Amino acid sequence: LYIRPLLFGSEGTLAVRAASTYRFLIITAPVQEYFDRQGQGIYLKAEHRFTRASPGGTGGAKTAGNYAATLQPMSDSASAGFDQILWLDGVEHRYVEEAGQMNIFFHIGDTIVTPDLSGTILPGITRDTVLTILREWGYKIEERRIAMDEVITANKAGNLREAFGAGTAAVVVPIDRIHYLGQDLQLPQTGNHSLCQQLYQMITELQFGVTQDNHGWSVLVD
């Protein structure tokens, strides 16, 4: 069940300003898995031309307007065979930000690295869930900028153990390849015992009530 809160201005005006009245809705819809990957990781295109969000904008908020700039590049990437776009920063087009509707994580050595919340990245609920669980499991976490060059270097050196995305619709999904500047970066193959799979199992068990929720994340609806 996918649950999406929605708030929109409902004032009867065409004036270019904030509305004085709003309507709040909650949309619930049964959905299938976001990626029909059949156990395989997804294929991302690191976008170095188009930008999802820039400093000083609304990239850190879940606003409908943020999707406008992504529609054409997402359509183009899907036509080219990619599952999603890996968005880079809007200034240098070097630093990883997020992957489509997901926050992104890299398991490098004994550390989990994820882009920090700098105002252009959504503070995803699943991101927070993943970080909380990883800290409870004893993993070292770094929330910081990470450049594609660092990812490539870590992969070549054998230090990149896996990469995965996390979001409300996708839950947790492994990343198999990243296309960057005309080249494919093949990431380490992950299996049933990967960290990504462990996180997926833990989160879905919490969602379905199989595992006890000690965080107050689940709410019983009568």
For the regions a protein language model found, what residue spans apply to each?
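Extended, Lys/Arg-enriched charged tracts that mediate electrostatic binding to polyanionic substrates
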Residues: 1-8
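Helix-start/capping segments and mature chain N-termini
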Residues: 6, 13-222
